[in-house]
Amino acid sequence: MKIIQVADQNEGGKVAVEILRSKLAEGAKTLGLATGSSPLSFYKELIESDIDLSDLVSVNLDEYVGLEADDPQSYHYFMNENLFSHKPFKKSFLPNGKAEDAEEETEDYNRILSENPVDFQILGIGTNGHIGFNEPGTSFDSQTHLVDLTPSTIEANARFFETIDQVPTQAISMGIANIMAAKSIVLFAYGKGKAQAIAGTVAGPVTEELPASVLQGHEDVTIIADAEALSLLDN
């Protein structure tokens, strides 16, 4: 596990683009993408870079259940606004949050992931150590699944909605085993709110109670973080 301390999110985005550039030179074809505030600077730098995405495939970590793709709070909408409409991929896959049968959708998405193995996966991290929407207690063997969001995750995401009651209570998420199957992983963490989760991820016991701790067992993980997010780690 490699840790790169950056001054801020802007620098973090630049660093991640250069890591991606090196992976593309090694033949990477499929990118695993995330939503939320942490990867935004990466997408901005990627759009402004000379990297061509038109021959690449993307797969996203997750999507809320119950939101249409054109809902401004859906992750389809987020990705279109912040990356796809500026720099499209050859093909982009996201879970369908409006699928009639959510369990069937998880099976379909697992098939998509098996057909498009991820070479380079972007992650954020929740204050409770979740990656994707894999909440504490999620099995490390989990594949794409239907998730009941925890109160802390619903509260954290409420800032994107008019009221907390509008926040979806379920999501479809890649499982931890899906994430760990990626050849290379970059995780972003910014701010003191992420410090405890990062300390556990890097130096704590590997436990399903802190989902991101599983990354200790991956051979190619880079954490890009600011001083506040790294503040509980010993130098």
Curated annotation (Swiss-Prot):
GO terms for cellular component: cytoplasm. Gene3D superfamilies: 3.40.50.1360. One of its GO terms (biological process) is carbohydrate metabolic process. Transmembrane segments: none annotated. Pathway: Amino-sugar metabolism; N-acetylneuraminate degradation; D-fructose 6-phosphate from N-acetylneuraminate: step 5/5. Keywords: Carbohydrate metabolism, Hydrolase. It is an enzyme of class 3 (hydrolase). It comes from the Bacteria. Its EC number is 3.5.99.6. InterPro entries: Glc/Gal-6P_isomerase, Glucosamine6P_isomerase, Glucosamine6P_isomerase_CS, NagB/RpiA_transferase-like. It catalyses: alpha-D-glucosamine 6-phosphate + H2O = beta-D-fructose 6-phosphate + NH4(+). GO terms for molecular function: glucosamine-6-phosphate deaminase activity; identical protein binding. The active site is at residues 62, 128, 130, 135. Belongs to the glucosamine/galactosamine-6-phosphate isomerase family. NagB subfamily. Catalyzes the reversible isomerization-deamination of glucosamine 6-phosphate (GlcN6P) to form fructose 6-phosphate (Fru6P) and ammonium ion. This is Glucosamine-6-phosphate deaminase.
